């Protein structure tokens, strides 16, 4: 028994139909008024952008949950139509303000891009991968698969029918 791996069911799905945000969701700092809404579009979490970024250690727009296992599969669907080149949206694998990985959608000119960036302690933020999303229609599913300390990242532009490999990190 001792040599067998032990697993806890940490499966979690949130369809955002409750009037209140589930307590499994967390914020980096104390949530400010009008940070998010569950009422604007029932069944969806609406996150409002803030002018701050992760690096400046101020309150930025982030709602997340803690990673509880080293082996997991994670998917999140995001609806986002960038209209302003100064705003981006996506997911973040966050350890601290000085150590994180982002996968975000943004607009540059008339093109839409998915870019993955890595920030490590005492290092500058670097772009790992940048992909032009020619078939982006305002909806994307981000997928992360973690096995034995290796993270593999995918995305889908067809509601999860097909996933495209983005990158891997260990």
Residue ranges: model-predicted function:
Residues 1-170:
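Extracellular glycan-recognition regions
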């Amino acid at each position: 028994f001792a040599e067998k791996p032990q697993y806890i069911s940490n499966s979690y799905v949130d369809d955002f139909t409750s009037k209140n945000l589930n307590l499994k969701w967390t914020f980096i700092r104390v949530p400010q008024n009008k940070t998010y809404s569950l009422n604007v579009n029932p069944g969806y979490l609406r996150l409002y952008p803030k002018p701050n970024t992760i690096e400046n250690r101020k309150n930025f727009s982030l709602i997340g949950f803690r990673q509880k296992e080293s082996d997991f599969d994670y998917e999140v669907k995001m609806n986002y139509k960038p209209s302003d080149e100064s705003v981006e949206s996506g997911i973040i694998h966050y350890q601290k303000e000085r150590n994180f990985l982002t996968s975000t959608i943004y607009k540059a000119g008339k093109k839409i891009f998915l870019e993955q960036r890595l920030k490590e302690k005492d290092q500058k933020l670097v772009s790992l991968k940048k992909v032009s999303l020619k078939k982006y229609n305002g909806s994307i599913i981000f997928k992360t698969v973690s096995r034995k300390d290796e993270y593999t990242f995918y995305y889908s532009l067809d509601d999860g029918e097909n996933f495209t490999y983005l990158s891997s990190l260990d």
